[in-house]
């Protein structure tokens, strides 16, 4: 099967919100789709101008990949595991801070502090996505302690999960396809099948892995349940 190449644009938050709104208003015929990340779900809670409901205004079609995060610390911090880091933070409440470069990193740090029962200062700018953090870990500028996904990452099988120490911790960034609300089931099913066929190709899997993303293949129903759980 030959697929026509399409150009995808990475856009600022404001433009992403505008495009989500445009897709929500489009005809549910399968010709206008939104490719987005997990920020799509949280944006309405962060930006008053979002004006869309990620559940009611869209039809989930396919979840295509997960982007795991790592818990990383400065090499000088005397901790080599999540448990040791928690012990340090409990011993000296308020001493340790965590930085973030995205909404997912903010949520990761806040969830860690809540579940572990420790006091951490948030410094907006610890949790970082794999492709951004891995070069620094390999250069020994950062120390990686764990991945944030509930299951071990296929990209970093040597790293333990946060959940192994902090039960209930499961955070990942993801990407997927959505259409307007009320799309016909047969159209959703066909689009899902076409997308999955591409995602499951070995060459596409390899390209996603190079970007630090784990390919994901599932049904529209599974994606719908996943989005509602977010």
Descriptions of predicted regions:
Residues 39-49, 106, 110-115, 127-158:
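A ligand-binding cleft/hinge motif common to bilobed small-molecule-binding domains
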Residues 6-14, 59-60, 98-100, 120-128, ...:
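Short beta-strand-to-loop elements that line the ligand-binding cleft
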Residues 219-230:
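Extracellular/periplasmic bilobal clamshell ligand-binding domains
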Residues 133, 152, 162, 204-205, ...:
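A generic structural signal for short hydrophobic patches within well-formed alpha-helices
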Residues 30-36, 99, 124-128, 143-146:
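Paired acidic/hydrophobic, glycine-rich loop segments that form the ligand-binding mouth/hinge
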Residues 11-19, 67, 80, 103-104, ...:
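Short helix-initiation/N-cap motifs at beta->coil->alpha
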Residues 1, 17-22, 45:
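Active-site pre-lysine segment of PLP-dependent enzymes
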Residues 25-30, 45-123, 162, 167, ...:
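Hinge/capping helix and adjacent helix->loop/strand transition within the periplasmic-binding protein
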